[in-house]
């Protein structure tokens, strides 16, 4: 497929087929049988399995597509410019300047 280097199309299709089988193996639970609590528990277990399938799918794609094993370094500003002073935060513009600017004429 265009735009990727070093990835075989057959490997990618194989990964997609594996992921498709994983998702098909966990259909949404039947909501017409059982008590409300039983249906709720089935949905809760289904969501937990979906989270597991999603995590496995990410690992499969990562193995087939590769990618950086370590997080990408983000450019940070110089440490001298970083402060924890709340006065320099720009949360609501104009709120601090209004507190002490009462003029009497």
Curated annotation (Swiss-Prot):
Record's keyword annotation contains tRNA processing: no
Cellular component terms (Gene Ontology): host cell cytoplasm; host cell nucleolus
Bias (Polar residues) ranges: 24-35, 95-105
Sequence motif Nuclear export signal and binding to XPO1, residues: 74-85
Keyword hit for RNA-binding: yes
Gene Ontology molecular-function annotations: DNA-binding transcription factor activity; RNA binding
Region feature Homomultimerization, mapped onto this chain: 18-26
Compositional bias per record (Basic residues), positions renumbered to this chain: 37-49
Annotated region described as Disordered, given as residue ranges: 24-49, 65-105
Superkingdom: Viruses
Post-translational modification: Asymmetrically arginine dimethylated at one site by host PRMT6. Methylation impairs the RNA-binding activity and export of viral RNA from the nucleus to the cytoplasm.
Location of the motif Nuclear localization signal and RNA-binding (RRE): 35-51
Subcellular locations according to the entry: Host nucleus, Host nucleolus; Host cytoplasm
Assigned keywords, A-Z: AIDS, Host cytoplasm, Host nucleus, Host-virus interaction, Methylation, mRNA transport, Phosphoprotein, RNA-binding, Transport
InterPro entries: REV_protein (IPR000625)
Pfam families: REV
Phosphoserine: modified positions: 5
GO terms for biological process, alphabetical: mRNA transport; viral process
HAMAP family in the record: REV_HIV1 (MF_04077)
Comment on protein domains: The RNA-binding motif binds to the RRE, a 240 bp stem-and-loop structure present in incompletely spliced viral pre-mRNAs. This region also contains the NLS which mediates nuclear localization via KPNB1 binding and, when the N-terminal sequence is present, nucleolar targeting. These overlapping functions prevent Rev bound to RRE from undesirable return to the nucleus. When Rev binds the RRE, the NLS becomes masked while the NES remains accessible. The leucine-rich NES mediates binding to human XPO1.
Functional summary from the UniProt entry: Escorts unspliced or incompletely spliced viral pre-mRNAs (late transcripts) out of the nucleus of infected cells. These pre-mRNAs carry a recognition sequence called Rev responsive element (RRE) located in the env gene, that is not present in fully spliced viral mRNAs (early transcripts). This function is essential since most viral proteins are translated from unspliced or partially spliced pre-mRNAs which cannot exit the nucleus by the pathway used by fully processed cellular mRNAs. Rev itself is translated from a fully spliced mRNA that readily exits the nucleus.
Family (UniProt): Belongs to the HIV-1 REV protein family.
Assembly with partners or alone: Homomultimer; when bound to the RRE. Multimeric assembly is essential for activity and may involve XPO1. Binds to human KPNB1, XPO1, TNPO1, RANBP5 and IPO7. Interacts with the viral Integrase. Interacts with human KHDRBS1. Interacts with human NAP1; this interaction decreases Rev multimerization and stimulates its activity. Interacts with human DEAD-box helicases DDX3 and DDX24; these interactions may serve for viral RNA export to the cytoplasm and packaging, respectively.
Note: HIV-1 lineages are divided in three main groups, M (for Major), O (for Outlier), and N (for New, or Non-M, Non-O). The vast majority of strains found worldwide belong to the group M. Group O seems to be endemic to and largely confined to Cameroon and neighboring countries in West Central Africa, where these viruses represent a small minority of HIV-1 strains. The group N is represented by a limited number of isolates from Cameroonian persons. The group M is further subdivided in 9 clades or subtypes (A to D, F to H, J and K).
Protein name per Swiss-Prot or TrEMBL: Protein Rev
């Amino acid at each position: 497929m265009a735009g990727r280097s070093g990835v075989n199309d057959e490997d990618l299709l194989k990964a997609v087929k594996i992921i498709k089988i994983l998702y098909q193996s966990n259909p949404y639970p039947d909501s017409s049988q059982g008590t409300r609590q039983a249906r709720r528990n089935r949905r809760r277990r289904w969501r937990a399995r979906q989270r597991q399938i999603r995590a496995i799918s990410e690992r499969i794609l990562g193995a087939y597509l590769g990618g950086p094993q370590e997080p990408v370094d983000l450019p940070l500003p110089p440490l001298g410019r970083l402060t924890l002073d709340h006065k320099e935060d720009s949360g609501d513009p104009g709120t601090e300047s209004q507190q002490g600017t009462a003029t009497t004429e």
